From Swiss-Prot:
Topology class, membrane: Multi-pass membrane protein
GO cellular component, one term: plasma membrane
Protein name, UniProt field: Uncharacterized transporter sll1164
Top-rank lineage group of the source organism: Bacteria
Membrane-traversing stretches: 15-35, 53-73, 91-111, 120-140, 147-167, 179-199, 218-238, 248-268, 276-296, 302-322
Similarity comment text for this entry: Belongs to the EamA transporter family.
Positions of the EamA domain: 39-164, 191-319
Pfam family, one: EamA
Lineage of source species: Bacteria, Bacillati, Cyanobacteriota, Cyanophyceae, Synechococcales
Annotated compartments: Cell membrane
PANTHER family: INNER MEMBRANE TRANSPORTER (PTHR32322), S-ADENOSYLMETHIONINE_S-ADENOSYLHOMOCYSTEINE TRANSPORTER (PTHR32322:SF18)
Length: 349
């Protein structure tokens, strides 16, 4: 058995980074449609009128699966001498980013899936890099070139087309903030994710990636649970031990969470700047395709046009990244923190 396990490890090490990245991208792209489909299936197993595979149950149990995986991978970073190096400011910012990125933002994304279709969630979620660039200019005072600005503007127009196309009075809709609840949740989640990205880049680069990742997952799961309890009561999680929930979550956790996260981390180990940016570019396209294949969601005219504009913006952004990156940066791995925070949309947790 030991020989077989050792041979399997050797085989995994021989697999090239692009293959791992491609596998992770496919899994992450399918995460939203698969989540929605599993929750739909849960309606056939209702317990006294309650769906045991609810969004909150899936998010909570999925996060527990992810947390277990992160602890196995990153436990060497949790050594006392490393923890003592963190200042009070580090712990405070870690706590803020954990609550925002691992409790509030995912909760909003899951709530959005209840209110609108997956295609809208994917397209409007592309606001995150737009918000990140704007906040970087305002808060970090970074300089941007014209191509980056054009890419951002086109992406923003693409989201606007998705939301406003076919609306009789778009101006009145904006003034009264009369957006769809699901669409609003996605936009707010994108803004929150952008804030955490800025905080991570500005203040948390010196913190070991293992401490950063495990602490975010642990605190985020804890805070999400108590937010849900405060809003809905303990009864909201009364079906969390349901066998049917765990049966599906073992599949979901094994494929979407474990295989997806392991493939992503393995791919990042030796991935180049270009490969990671390509992953970010391809993911939303595949997500829309999976929404059609798994949920039979046919994009509307607004989604087609908005998606084309978003794709154009993403391509221009990719070209800009290639032009501005130094040759040596394009051929070596990214900083581990920057790589892990690459925007590839919802990752299942």
């Amino acid at each position: 058995m030991k020989h077989v396990f050792s041979g399997f490890q050797t085989f995994l090490k021989q697999v090239h980074s692009p293959i791992y990245l491609a596998l992770a991208v496919v899994i992450f792209s399918a995460a939203n449609p698969v989540t929605s489909r599993i929750i739909e299936l849960g309606k056939t197993y209702e317990i006294n009128g309650r769906n045991p595979i609810s969004f909150c149950n899936v998010l909570f149990v999925g996060n527990l699966c992810a947390l277990g995986l992160m602890i196995l991978i990153f436990h060497p970073d949790w050594q006392l001498h490393k923890l003592r190096k963190l200042t009070r400011k580090d712990w405070f910012l870690l706590t803020v980013t954990a609550i925002l990125s691992r409790a509030i933002a995912p909760g909003l994304m899951f709530s959005a899936l209840e209110k609108t279709n997956v295609t809208n969630v994917v397209l409007i979620g592309r606001l995150e890099p737009v918000f990140t660039l704007i906040l970087s200019i305002l808060l970090l005072k970074i300089s941007v070139n014209w191509l980056s600005m054009v890419a951002t503007l086109i992406s923003f127009v693409g989201v606007a087309v998705t939301v406003f196309w076919g609306v009789a009075d778009p101006l009145d809709m904006v003034i009264n903030f009369d957006f769809g609840l699901g669409e609003s949740f996605v936009a707010i989640a994108a803004f929150i994710s952008a804030i955490t990205t800025i905080l991570s880049k500005q203040q948390l680069q010196s913190i070991p990636v293992g401490i950063f990742t495990v602490y975010r997952s642990l605190l985020g799961t804890f805070v999400f649970f108590w937010i849900a309890v405060i809003i809905y009561g303990f009864d909201h999680f009364m079906d969390v031990s349901s066998p049917i929930l765990w049966r599906w979550m073992l599949i979901y956790g094994a494929i979407i969470v474990v295989v997806g996260q392991v493939a992503w981390l393995a791919g990042l180990k030796n991935a180049s700047f270009i490969q990671i940016n390509l992953a970010s570019l391809v993911t939303p396209i595949l997500a829309i395709i999976f929404a059609y294949l798994i949920l039979l969601e046919t994009p509307t005219n607004a989604q087609y046009l908005g998606g084309i504009l978003l794709l154009l913006g993403a391509i221009l952004s990719f070209i800009d990244n290639l032009k501005t990156a130094k040759d040596k940066q394009a051929s070596k791995p990214l900083n581990s923190r920057e790589a892990m925070d690459t925007n590839v949309g919802f990752r299942g947790v």
